[in-house]
Amino acid sequence: MRKLSQLVTLFFIVSFGWAQTSGKLRGTVSSSDGQALAGANVIVDGTSMGAATDGDGGYTILNVPAGRYSVTATYIGYKSTTESNVTVKVNLTTPMNFNLESSAVEGEAVTIVGQKRLIERSATNSVRTVDAEEIQNAASRSVTGMLDMQAGVTITNGKLHIRGSRAEEVAYTLDGAQITDVINTGRDISAIPEALAEIAVEAGGYGAHVGGANSGVVRQTLRTGGNEFGGNVRFESGDYGHTDMTATIGGPLGPVRFFAALRNTHTDDWNPSFYESFDIDVDGDGVVDDLASYESGVTPDGDTIQVSFDGSSIAHRVQDNMQLNTTASMDFGPLNLRLTGVMDNSTWQSNSLPIYYMFNTDRLPESERKLTMLATRVNFFLNPNFLLTAGFSTMNRSYESYDGLFGKPSGFQDALMWHDSASVASTMNAEAGANWKTSYTDPTSYYVGLFPFQRPGDITTGWSKNNRTTLGIDAGMTYQMGDHEIRAGLDIKQYTYRKYYLSTSAMEQVNRLVATSDDVASFDDAASGSNETVTDALSLYLRGGQIGYDDYGNEYDEGFDGPREPSSMSFYVNDKYEAGDITINMGVRVDQFNMDDWKMNDPANPGWDESNQGIYTDQFSESTVKTSLQPRLGLAFPVTDETVFHLQYGKFAQMPELDLPYASTRYMHLVWGGQNYTPDPMGFDLDPIETTQYEVGMSYQFLPDAAIDVTAFAKNTTGQLLLDHKHEVGIDNTYGASADAPYYENGDFTTVNGFEFTLRTRRISRLMTYASYTWSDARGINSDPNSNAGNLDQNALSPPPMMISPLYYTNKHRGAVSMDYRFGADEGLLSGLGFNLQYKVNSGHPFTLSDGGMGQRAANEGALLQDARSREPQEPVGMSTTPWQNYVNLKADYTLSLGGVGVQLFAYVENLFDTKNVINVYHRSGNAYDDNFLTDPKLSTEIVAANGDLYVDLYENVNLANRQHYSWDFGQDLFGSPRIVKFGASVSF
């Protein structure tokens, strides 16, 4: 509360800041013979936004929300002129010059339909936008699918990277409010496609008003209600049980222009994959074999099972999602207000290993995520050229994962029932309860051929939950002083983070105490929080500890294990000078980062409290607030009306991924104990990550309806996190902490060079085309903070060698083409028919051919090299590359008008040719089809000899054909998604 009150106080004291939701109109009004018309009025139709021209006929209209408008210029004695289809983009200037014709009759008017701008003369960096029309026509109906088409953007294993960056170096906003997942990277919200006015990608080089993003910003801007009521109802259905119902409505309500979109989606399989059906029939008689089960793979247990897998229908992967996106704009002349509200609630079932879980799908995990965002912005014009603005936003994200059989628990005691055989029997069935070895000991799996298949009723998940809150406050001013747009602002953000996990082993121990200990009278007693025996057991078996919760799942706000509350405060000043032949955008930004982590008072002697399973808190203090100064400079040179050059230099800074340094005191005790390998340790007093970037580019409109953009860039990022030892820690330090305990430290870097090419056309003979190509060379020491775990382990207390190599998440070559073909309104039966084709290609990502032994792995897992400590590179790191990937998406739609109502029928196909794209490979073989285990005698000979054809048959079907061992180890797949067909209809009014 103390921090919150400080933020609110600052909010009312300071008058600086800006949110990225609007652009501006700028131009001149002159007569047809070129004479400047002073005092002409320029109005954005349907709004109170407008300006009068100065003595040179020039005007500027600030703070125009992104979208499409009609703009009218009027002057006494001249025909009023209206230009429609005027597109305003966030943070860019829309040039609009009017030439008015003299009029002998009062009230004469001229209407002009504006054309799509192909060159942004005011942009001093690379900005790629997708407007509402392009979003609606696209063959991929997802924000991610549209981002994947943009130059500089790479999506590898579900994570988005911009210009060779790590995923955590990309920021995301929605209607100017931050929606970045600062804990685990990525974005928390994807807006409803029909609610979007535009999506924009800024690949670095932005002005001083943008922070917290070293490599790029992805902006989603919601639509504003129009001057008339209108709406749309849309329904689609498709493969894998997919349904989608979306409705939008917007228009005026008195002084309010509102817009709302509601979307409800359902799918039976939210993660479709290339699975292959199989039956285990070792004797080849055409009948599925009855296979004897063995206790832990050794002793017959008297049970038999049939292994028959249907790869076309995977159980327990249902997902349901409900979204609401709303905006409301109120215009009171010099004062206007915009409100944004977002709700995004999802529930989904998980089944990452459908073959191993085929007999126990009822007990697989289910998860729930609830997200709300509220934002408000107040703008006040002191005069047409002086704008004050203030904004407030808050976002809350809660997540919970639980047992699918029992459902969401109301508390600790409910979760204990998951590990109680009587509760399993009464909730599932008697047979499932009877499978348990004791009332508190879960059953062993069916082992056939050394492959474990879970028995019905076995527990599969613990109880986990986390909660994150983001609070943002900003205020600002914009002053248009002639050709100078001067902006200054203050931006404050605070985050609150809590996480909790109750493991199945802890559940088992508490249930054991209830069943066998005189010190625990009942489940009520166990869940009371006051039973010391239970509290001690939880402390022993929940070694990871909690942040912001106690071990019983109650919120906890005190001490070192309370919630983490990192924050940032930023101040900037920026001057954008726009004259006819040059644009100069220069500014400086100062960021202060408070990580809310700790620092050790004596790094050579960590305060490890061995006896109390924690730390000596007096040996730690709050980390210092870090300050970063970031100058920015961008220039644009419109050499001709068709050619613009731009240059950019800038420094950028951000906090590290916050999930990495945070650890409970109990987990710190575990790491310093040194008995266990802990690949995800903690960090202390970490510094910001900083980037320096240079960019030069040219935009050239080589035809009246076509333009290209070529941009070259280079950047260097320092201070990225990596695993390291505290080399100053001695073997005989006073508290006895392990000298080879790992830590997250600043010390990594990335160097990226590349260029981007884009082609964009207006509609030419029904066809509109967009194409992009990116070449990049991204190198560094590590691709992620844990990449050097093997090196660190093998080099013990000496620093591992620093070798620069290609980063595994990058594509050296990446391209995309979108072709949108539409028949016009006067082409008979074909009127309203349209097609959209997307083609995406990339050259794969780097990997390293490696060898090594099996390590501590079960026979059914093979010898995958998941643990970096057991990998032995057979070539320079990152020397090999996965195969090229190709994706084709196609959409066809037909629109007709029935009595003023628009009806559209549509169908679209993702991965049109059902291409089995290889997105990852086995490190040992370098391909996605054979892991080299069965073919390598030194790895598998003894196992195969002891278990025969059944083992081989299972290994080939479970692992090689269906990648269960790879999913188990890496949590991802070797192949991209299969073909998905969707179709539906929409009605617009």
Which residues make up each language-model segment?
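Signature of Gram-negative outer-membrane beta-barrel scaffolds
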Residues: 311, 315, 460, 487-642, ...
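Transmembrane beta-barrel wall of Gram-negative outer-membrane proteins
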Residues: 239-350, 366-389, 631
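C-terminal beta-signal and adjacent terminal beta-strands/loops
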Residues: 273, 826-868, 883-887, 895-989
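Periplasm-facing N-terminal accessory domains of Gram-negative outer-membrane beta-barrel systems
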Residues: 18-109, 113
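Periplasmic N-terminal accessory/gating domains of Gram-negative outer-membrane beta-barrel systems
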Residues: 79, 84-95, 108-207, 217, ...
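Gram-negative outer-membrane beta-barrel transporters
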Residues: 712-716, 721-847
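Membrane-embedded beta-barrel scaffold of Gram-negative outer-membrane proteins
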Residues: 646, 650, 656, 660, ...
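Short loop/turn motifs that connect adjacent beta-strands in outer-membrane beta-barrel proteins
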Residues: 208-210, 225-230, 254-255, 333-334, ...
